Amino acid sequence: MTRHSRSATVKLRRGRRSDLDALVALEHALFDSQFFAGHLIARASFRRLLASPGATFLVAEAGKQIGAQIGIQVGAQVGAYVLVLYRANSGAARIYSIGVAARFRRRGLARSLVAAAEKDAVRRGRKAMRLEVRADDRGTIALYESSGYRRIGRAPGYYNGRVDALRLEKVLGKEPRRDL
């Protein structure tokens, strides 16, 4: 999937081993290592997860567009990612981590990555997508709720014993019912 946004072309694709340095740098730039202690993905874990059949990495690769008709990108870089985990014998997938570099925010990348992750989960036979989000992160909560996620619980002190997490879930494969 390719999107054009503010003079940049954004391509969603599966993560590759060659993305390892960019993914590690993005994870550590986005998440405070003291606040998110125990939740940050280490380099070795990224490497293992990129090769794991129980995980899907999707990345948004952004670059300058040249030749609009032929769609060539130059200077492409990983601007965002989502990591989805799949447990055997579970009907649900889990968004474990999602991040968008500051300079690529407000372009719909997170929403596009979540939608692509949901499609992948449906393709793998999952009936629901679950995740945790900081209870004080109103913007991210609004993104998920506007995408059909609902609150199913709260985890006190989930983030380093200091901030609660909300547990969210979306039933996949069905359009939400709209009352007339």
Predicted features by range, described:
Residues 5-7:
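Serine residues within intrinsically disordered or low-complexity segments
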Residues 57, 127-130, 134-141, 147, ...:
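C-terminal "cap" of GNAT-fold acetyltransferases
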Residues 21, 141-142:
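Alpha-helical elements of the RecA-like P-loop NTPase motor core of helicases
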Residues 3, 14-105, 111-116, 120-124, ...:
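Acetyl-CoA-dependent GNAT
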Residues 152-155:
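Beta-hairpin "wing" of winged helix-turn-helix
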